[in-house]
């Protein structure tokens, strides 16, 4: 069994855009820390970044399932390890 990849150009573009937004969120957190913003505000931004990263992860898992549905054991293993 080979590992599935993101072959669809639109899927790649969507994932790249998603990751760029996450990158921006993380930069915002770093800036907030430098600017001595409240812990509550920083935690809120971290929570948003974490949720966005989780969505990106589950999109990758979805890609695996769509491209190789018979690889359910591997998907289950990855979810147990990283999910």
List where the protein language model places each region.
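Solvent-exposed interaction patches of small proteins and small membrane subunits
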Residues: 1-83
